[in-house]
Design a protein with these regions (language model features):
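Repeat-based blade/solenoid architectures
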Residues: 82-103, 150-158, 213-214
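N-terminal signal peptide c-region/cleavage motif recognized by signal peptidases
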Residues: 30-32
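Bacterial N-terminal signal peptides
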Residues: 17-28
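Beta-propeller blade repeat segments, especially FG-GAP/WD-type strand-to-loop junctions
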Residues: 72-74, 130-146, 183-202
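Acidic/hydrophobic-patterned starts of short beta strands in beta-sheet-rich repeat architectures
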Residues: 48-54, 108-123, 163-175
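Acidic, small-residue rich beta-repeat scaffolds with periodic aromatic anchors
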Residues: 34-63, 172-289
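A short, structured loop/turn motif at beta-sheet edges
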Residues: 74-78, 107-115, 139-144, 159-168, ...
Length: 289
């Protein structure tokens, strides 16, 4: 199941992280200043491979430190290093599962080749962004582990064997839709499915039409909910992306135009500007050719 899910940190963490972003570390005081940083150790194992993720947490400063990952094979250390600063200018590499009382390090054979990878899920400390993962792959020729860093953005991911072939796809949401057509609260995101092979992640979403169909159906019902008063342009944009992936772009845009004229699709953008921006955005992001 999921190392961490789509929803981001809980309310307590979002509020604290937002205060840090706006006012600095001194703004967040959740315990007495005298409390010392508390050390933590997480362990994960599969076969002969064991990963140990250690760190300290200072609750008064809302800050993690001394983050270190060690990977052993048959009891012999093959990798040991302190974590680098997060990509994208994040202020702190936080264990993604810490505040949900879950592990953030996993040993699992993602690609089904018999050699387990080590996955470290992290968060870099914003109101709801950003989640990222470090995936460590063993290279027998060099007897070393090489990391791949992937930024998920405002969402996490789940592992799922969608192809039923023994390998695991990584299912997430397309974060590029955040704020594109509405506020974050009124944005929605089409499903995005990645495959890990030979140390690389590739987008394989179009392969999984049934997953796209289920996602499109849920988005459509959300957009057309008669109780919804806020903008639904962000939801419709995500739905249109799904439709493009299954070859229904022309029908989707006709539907959008008809419902925009009747007022059932509404938001900050006028009908013409929304349709123009949506076409341009879907071309730029690879959904529409």
């Amino acid at each position: 199941m999921a190392p961490f899910g789509f929803r981001g940190y809980n309310g307590r963490v979002r509020a604290a992280a937002l205060a840090v972003a706006l006012f600095g570390l001194g703004a967040v005081v959740v315990t007495t200043a005298a409390a010392a940083p508390k050390p933590h150790v997480e362990r994960a194992r599969a076969g002969a491979v064991e990963a140990v993720f250690s760190y300290s947490y200072d609750a008064a400063a809302f800050r993690f430190s001394r983050q270190r990952l060690v990977i052993d094979r048959d009891g012999v250390t093959s990798f040991a290093a302190r974590l680098r600063k997060p990509p994208g200018g994040g202020f702190n590499a936080q264990p993604a599962g810490y505040f949900a009382h879950r592990r953030s390090v996993f040993v699992t054979d993602i690609d089904g080749d018999g050699e387990p990878e080590v996955v470290l899920d992290l968060y870099w400390g914003g109101a709801h962004c950003c989640w990222y993962s470090q995936i460590y792959r063993y290279a027998p020729a060099t007897k070393r582990y090489a990391p791949l860093v992937h930024v998920w953005g405002n969402f996490g991911y789940v592992f799922a064997d969608l192809a039923h072939d023994g390998s695991q796809e990584l299912v997430t949401r397309d974060d590029r839709f955040s704020y594109a057509f509405a506020s974050f609260a009124d944005s929605r995101w089409p499903v995005r499915i990645l495959r890990y092979r030979a140390g690389r992640l590739t987008v394989e979403t179009p392969t999984y039409r049934s997953e796209i169909g289920r996602d499109a159906n849920a988005l459509w019902h959300a957009a057309m909910n008669p109780k919804r008063k806020a903008s639904n342009q962000g939801i419709v944009a995500a739905w249109a992306a799904d439709q493009c992936l299954v070859g229904h772009a022309a029908v989707a845009f006709k539907t959008i135009d008809r419902l925009s004229r009747s007022g059932k699709i509404h938001g900050e953008l006028s009908r013409v500007k929304f349709e123009q921006k949506l076409r341009s955005f879907l071309r730029r992001t690879g959904y529409l050719s």
